[in-house]
Amino acid sequence: MNETMIHCWDGHVSSLKIAIVIADSSGEPFEEIKTALHPGIWERLAFLGVDIFYVKGEEPTGLQQILNNFSEGLRYSKFWPVQNLLDRFLLLKFNSRIPSCSVNQQFIEVKICEGLRTLGVKMLSAYRYIYQENYDYIFKTTLSSIVNEEVFLSFIEDLPKEGIIYGGTPVNFGKHPFASGSNTLLNRAALEFIFDHVNHWNHGFLDDVAMGRIFEGIAEVTPIASLHIESMDQINRISSHEIKQTIHFRCKSRSEPRNDVEIIRELKKRLKASEDDDTI
């Protein structure tokens, strides 16, 4: 990867080393999104020197897929405490032994089976690689997300230079707030804190919830302006000013089949139009 990061926007130059890590996934609508949009939707940030990675696990075996399905069936039911205890126990070994990964161009390939229950393990492996490669910031997101590039980079540049940065879309989860896994920003101090306390990571929770528990009482979520776009009609109702001021967009439609690709393409057009309009 690049040894020196130089980002230029509005005549500004920064030497921050930034990585964007996208939690890869298989099946639909993700295959359609990857085929139609990736990695092209990140090409502008890549041109500015930001490194883009897709984090992949291994294809689950038949038995592993049965366990994945069983876990997810419990997770969203009244029996979720059983799921939490079961996955926490079965994945406990990864608190002391994060699996290795290999890097093939833009892909960080982790030696763990794919699945929501192992997403935290997969991302911890990717975070360790990013930390070892001396990145200043890591932004974790999803295949159905995009960012407003110039606002994104300016936001990072203006952050405090000291202390833990744990940023994202704040999610109020009772007494346990956390940053949404589709929009999470961490600096080196945050990554270091995670690895120093990884033995407390609860793999019974999804990765973003587990991360929130790690930072609980230590660092509050630094809000990153975000919009969750669910339909084409919603895009048409959003003002150009709001689009220009928003950093992160989660484009996850409610329709069946999902039309995330159409939404992302239209949103990219609106972003381009807002950049070209100096009156906004």
Q: What positions do the PLM features span?
A:
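Conserved, well-structured core segments
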Residues: 20-22, 52, 69, 183-185
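N-proximal low-complexity "stem/linker" segments adjacent to membrane-targeting elements
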Residues: 1-29
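Active-site-proximal specificity loops/subdomain of glycosyltransferases
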Residues: 55-134
